[in-house]
Design a protein with these regions (language model features):
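Hydrophobic/aromatic-rich alpha-helical bundle segments in the mid-to-C-terminal region
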Residues: 121, 132, 136, 140, ...
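Hydrophobic alpha-helical connector segments
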Residues: 67, 71, 85-114, 170-173, ...
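Hydrophobic/aromatic residues within well-ordered alpha-helical segments
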Residues: 22, 72, 76, 80, ...
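Helical hydrophobic small-molecule/effector-binding pocket
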Residues: 78-86, 99-124, 178-185
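Short secondary-structure transition hinges
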Residues: 99-101, 114-148, 196
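Helix-turn-helix
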Residues: 25, 33-67, 71
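N-terminal intrinsically disordered/low-complexity leader segments
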Residues: 1-21, 91, 95, 190
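Generic hydrophobic, amphipathic alpha-helix propensity
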Residues: 18-30, 47, 72-80, 84
């Protein structure tokens, strides 16, 4: 039997500056539209019109409508990575104690998770599952970069960490904080509990829990 043709990529790479500008316009258009209504109620024509391009241009660039959700995902990842690299830079983190470092990381995470909430929920609900490996790979690369940087900063404050198993503690602390932030910001799971708490208070309490675990 002949081998099946490989699945086409989600887009054709934008090699020329004009193509890159077109993709940026489409990304902005999709971001605006997904804030207005669910992705399933958005057509390719809607995105093209908002971006100021022809429908044919979209289909020449992207495999199909759902492939455009990669734009939302890459926008989230790229924005978060830039923010983490800036706000957790050596210059900004110099001299900070463990609690201050943890607060800076958790505050940034909460802000970015809330900022991109609508777009990420649209991706989670509508992404083509045949592209699951692409999304997973993108997330893994991002986590390796950001979590790797954060672990390094935490290790530099080893004297403040009293947990007997440093590496296990670092990884579980990051996991606990990240999972709680995602659940609270994206799923809004705190609504199931009899508590009223704003983002600033949530950052404060999550920071306390993070530091307390590392010092247990």
């Amino acid at each position: 039997m002949p081998k099946a043709s490989p699945r086409p990529g989600w887009r054709h790479e934008a090699a020329q500056e004009r193509s890159q500008r077109t993709e940026a316009a489409l990304a902005r258009a999709l971001a605006e539209l997904t804030k207005e209504r669910p992705f399933e109620n958005i057509s390719v024509a809607d995105v093209a019109k908002r971006a100021g391009v022809a429908v044919g241009t979209v289909y020449r660039r992207f495999r199909d409508k759902r492939a455009m959700l990669h734009l939302s995902d890459t926008a989230f990842v790229d924005d978060c990575r830039r923010a983490f690299d800036d706000e957790l830079s050596d210059e900004r983190m110099a001299g900070l104690r463990l609690e201050q470092l943890a607060r800076a990381y958790i505050d940034l995470m909460i802000r970015k998770f809330r900022e991109h909430r609508t777009a990420i929920l649209q991706v989670q609900r509508n992404a083509d599952q045949r592209d699951a490996a692409i999304y997973a790979g993108r997330a893994a690369e991002f986590n390796a970069h950001v979590h790797g940087r954060f672990r390094t900063l935490l290790r530099e404050r080893r004297k403040e960490i009293t947990h007997p198993d440093l590496e296990t503690a670092l990884n579980l602390a990051i996991f606990f904080a990240s999972a709680a932030a995602r659940d609270a910001m994206w799923r809004q799971s705190l609504k199931a509990y009899p508590i009223q708490i704003d983002d600033a208070a949530f950052v404060h309490e999550l920071t306390r829990a993070f530091v307390a675990y590392l010092q247990s």
